[in-house]
């Protein structure tokens, strides 16, 4: 009869020995096989690492290519701009001053009217009207007043000089919207004697008429501006030559009109209107008269 305790002990010993054999077998694995296993295990990881490095290299290469393309584009743009700057600039076509004036006047608000003034008071009327338009709050109706002028050559006592004189003596041009209020402001301006045409419902000038009146000054200004821009002297302009032989205090004979053959003494000369004011003796009394240059002759 066998002892149960001995059998259990024997089984335990065998179990322990089996475990030791397993451990030793594991330790006794061929080194070459281990290295092969390690190599097989590490190959995918190494391949993955190489793939990552390759992607990074490709990204860097793409960035460098993009930078090079952008730099080349910038260089091309700069070169194009420099070429445009270096290219000769074609001179602009000359602008017709009359056509430019016509277009400017056509776009302005209001219409142009002509008012009568006392001779020699044109500039004073212009200044008074501009001041009254502001002080009476009618600037939205009365826009502009103009006294057309021209430059002439005046010869007096042998001395020659250029002077500016009114082109329309006794008249002032006004650009305005005609209302009862604006009409009253203009009509009651000191020095104004009335509107040209219908006194209470005057007719405005046409565009052609106002262009014709203002064109000479516009042409002269355009010619001077073009000469200055080109660095040239102002172009010569044909001037009217006026010989003025009268002086205040001169005794003259009236040659035309109701006072013909009478003697007069000049006390005022107005070159703009080409008129003089003087005293004529009628029935033993001195009477003030206004005479034009062609109505008198120096004694």
Swiss-Prot record:
<dbReference type="InterPro" id="IPR015869">
    <property type="entry name" value="Transcrpt_antiterm_NusG_bac_CS"/>
</dbReference>
<feature type="domain" description="KOW">
    <location>
        <begin position="248"/>
        <end position="276"/>
    </location>
</feature>
<dbReference type="InterPro" id="IPR008991">
    <property type="entry name" value="Translation_prot_SH3-like_sf"/>
</dbReference>
<comment type="function">
    <text>Participates in transcription elongation, termination and antitermination.</text>
</comment>
<dbReference type="InterPro" id="IPR006645">
    <property type="entry name" value="NGN-like_dom"/>
</dbReference>
<dbReference type="InterPro" id="IPR043425">
    <property type="entry name" value="NusG-like"/>
</dbReference>
<dbReference type="GO" id="GO:0005829">
    <property type="term" value="C:cytosol"/>
</dbReference>
<dbReference type="Pfam" id="PF00467">
    <property type="entry name" value="KOW"/>
</dbReference>
<feature type="region of interest" description="Disordered">
    <location>
        <begin position="30"/>
        <end position="96"/>
    </location>
</feature>
<feature type="repeat" description="2">
    <location>
        <begin position="70"/>
        <end position="73"/>
    </location>
</feature>
<keyword id="KW-0804">Transcription</keyword>
<dbReference type="Pfam" id="PF02357">
    <property type="entry name" value="NusG"/>
</dbReference>
<dbReference type="InterPro" id="IPR005824">
    <property type="entry name" value="KOW"/>
</dbReference>
<feature type="repeat" description="4">
    <location>
        <begin position="84"/>
        <end position="87"/>
    </location>
</feature>
<dbReference type="GO" id="GO:0031564">
    <property type="term" value="P:transcription antitermination"/>
</dbReference>
<keyword id="KW-0806">Transcription termination</keyword>
<feature type="compositionally biased region" description="Acidic residues">
    <location>
        <begin position="54"/>
        <end position="87"/>
    </location>
</feature>
<keyword id="KW-0677">Repeat</keyword>
<feature type="repeat" description="3; approximate">
    <location>
        <begin position="80"/>
        <end position="83"/>
    </location>
</feature>
<dbReference type="GO" id="GO:0140673">
    <property type="term" value="P:transcription elongation-coupled chromatin remodeling"/>
</dbReference>
<keyword id="KW-0889">Transcription antitermination</keyword>
<keyword id="KW-0805">Transcription regulation</keyword>
<protein>
    <recommendedName>
        <fullName>Transcription termination/antitermination protein NusG</fullName>
    </recommendedName>
</protein>
<feature type="region of interest" description="4 X 4 AA repeats of E-E-A-A">
    <location>
        <begin position="46"/>
        <end position="87"/>
    </location>
</feature>
<dbReference type="InterPro" id="IPR036735">
    <property type="entry name" value="NGN_dom_sf"/>
</dbReference>
<dbReference type="GO" id="GO:0006353">
    <property type="term" value="P:DNA-templated transcription termination"/>
</dbReference>
<dbReference type="InterPro" id="IPR047050">
    <property type="entry name" value="NGN"/>
</dbReference>
<comment type="similarity">
    <text>Belongs to the NusG family.</text>
</comment>
<dbReference type="InterPro" id="IPR014722">
    <property type="entry name" value="Rib_uL2_dom2"/>
</dbReference>
<dbReference type="GO" id="GO:0032784">
    <property type="term" value="P:regulation of DNA-templated transcription elongation"/>
</dbReference>
<dbReference type="InterPro" id="IPR001062">
    <property type="entry name" value="Transcrpt_antiterm_NusG"/>
</dbReference>
<feature type="repeat" description="1">
    <location>
        <begin position="46"/>
        <end position="49"/>
    </location>
</feature>
């Amino acid at each position: 009869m066998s002892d149960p305790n001995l059998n259990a002990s024997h089984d335990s010993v065998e179990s322990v020995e089996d475990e030791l054999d397993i451990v030793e077998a594991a330790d006794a694995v061929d080194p070459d096989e281990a290295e092969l296993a390690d190599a097989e295990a590490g190959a995918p990881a190494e391949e993955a690492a190489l793939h990552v490095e390759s992607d990074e290299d490709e990204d860097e290469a793409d960035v460098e290519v993009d930078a090079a393309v952008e730099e080349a584009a910038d260089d091309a743009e700069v070169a194009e701009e420099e070429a445009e700057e270096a290219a000769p600039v074609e001179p602009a076509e000359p602008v017709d001053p009359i056509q430019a004036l016509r277009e400017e006047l056509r776009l302005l608000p209001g219409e142009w009217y002509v008012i009568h003034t006392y001779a020699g008071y044109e500039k004073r009327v212009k200044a008074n009207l501009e001041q009254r338009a502001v002080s009476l709050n009618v600037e939205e109706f009365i826009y502009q007043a103009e006294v057309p002028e021209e430059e002439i050559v005046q010869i007096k006592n042998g001395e020659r000089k250029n002077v500016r004189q009114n082109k329309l003596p006794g008249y002032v041009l006004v650009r305005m919207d005609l209302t009862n209020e604006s009409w009253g402001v203009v009509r009651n301006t000191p020095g104004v004697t009335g509107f040209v045409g219908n006194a209470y419902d005057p007719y405005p000038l046409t565009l052609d008429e106002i262009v014709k009146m203002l064109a000479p000054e516009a042409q002269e200004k355009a010619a001077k501006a073009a000469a200055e821009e080109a660095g040239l002297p102002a172009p010569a302009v044909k001037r009217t030559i006026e010989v003025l032989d009268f002086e205040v205090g001169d005794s003259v004979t009236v040659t035309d009109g109701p006072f013909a053959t009478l003697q007069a003494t000049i006390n005022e000369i107005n070159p703009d209107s080409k008129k003089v004011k003087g005293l004529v003796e009628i029935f033993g009394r001195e009477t003030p008269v206004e005479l034009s240059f062609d109505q008198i002759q120096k004694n």
